[in-house]
Amino acid sequence: MARKSFGQHFLLDLNVTRKIARLAQVGEGDTVVEVGPGPGGLTRALLETGARVVAIEKDSRFLPLLAEVAEVAEGRLELVEGDALKVDAAQAAGGPAHVVSNLPYNVGTQLLINWLTGPFRPLSMTLMFQKEVADRIVAQPGDDAYGRLAVIAQTLCEARTVMDLPAKAFTPPPKVASAVVRLVPKAEPPPAEVVAALERVTAAAFGQRRKMLRSSLKALGGADLCERAGVSPDARAEVIDLAGFLDLARATLGGADQ
């Protein structure tokens, strides 16, 4: 039933889906956007909390089954047929919303980046990823998994792994383990122009992660940029913490006090 081309692996164990719903900390009066509900295992658990669910599903095979769930959900389940990368999630939600999803493996990272930096800013995100991707989101400086995704995600959100799942929890079982990451946006994130600069800096720095910053950031100012930011030009990207990257981003804009 699952389509490999869609990266589909379904969670059908109600004990697992209920735990994810609890970890999401949603309930009556909340709106939840769910991407890729499939046969509705997690959807049912979210509805049990009393939340309103907006489910975005690309695979039309599941719409009749989800429509049956909607019939007994007393108006709290809305179905949107479409590709989550193209659907206007803010419009679909109709207001502030949380995102809770077992994300399709092939688009999970791109969806997260869209939600972190795009016009739709969720109140919180409780997301299932491949374990490798989850590790990249919560990695710390010096970790093998530390990179651009960790810097951007942790600059904008508090991020932590809240649950690990073995492959056997899914139907069909994937070849890798999975994990649930919870991300809560920070109350005072950096201004948009600083975040845009941070994206440029991290793209350059981690694009050549084994090189010293004086080389990897050469197009942005190299050693001079590092000195203005108070960061060692002889350091490599993998050891620079969030504050260091923010200083580098601000320095590209002409200051470190934005």
From Swiss-Prot:
Record field: catalytic activity: adenosine(1518)/adenosine(1519) in 16S rRNA + 4 S-adenosyl-L-methionine = N(6)-dimethyladenosine(1518)/N(6)-dimethyladenosine(1519) in 16S rRNA + 4 S-adenosyl-L-homocysteine + 4 H(+)
Enzyme Commission no: 2.1.1.182
Location within or outside the cell: Cytoplasm
Pfam families: RrnaAD
Residue ranges that the Swiss-Prot or TrEMBL entry lists as coiled coil: none
Main location group: cytoplasm
Top-level class of the enzyme under EC nomenclature: transferase
Signal peptide from the UniProt entry: none
Cellular compartments per GO CC: cytosol
Residue positions binding S-adenosyl-L-methionine: 9, 11, 36, 57, 83, 102
Keywords: Cytoplasm, Methyltransferase, RNA-binding, rRNA processing, S-adenosyl-L-methionine, Transferase
Gene3D superfamilies: Ribosomal RNA adenine dimethylase-like, domain 2, Vaccinia Virus protein VP39
GO molecular function: 16S rRNA (adenine(1518)-N(6)/adenine(1519)-N(6))-dimethyltransferase activity; RNA binding
HAMAP family tied to this protein: 16SrRNA_methyltr_A (MF_00607)
Family: Belongs to the class I-like SAM-binding methyltransferase superfamily. rRNA adenine N(6)-methyltransferase family. RsmA subfamily.
Function according to Swiss-Prot or TrEMBL: Specifically dimethylates two adjacent adenosines (A1518 and A1519) in the loop of a conserved hairpin near the 3'-end of 16S rRNA in the 30S particle. May play a critical role in biogenesis of 30S subunits.
Listed NCBIfam families: ksgA
Protein name: Ribosomal RNA small subunit methyltransferase A
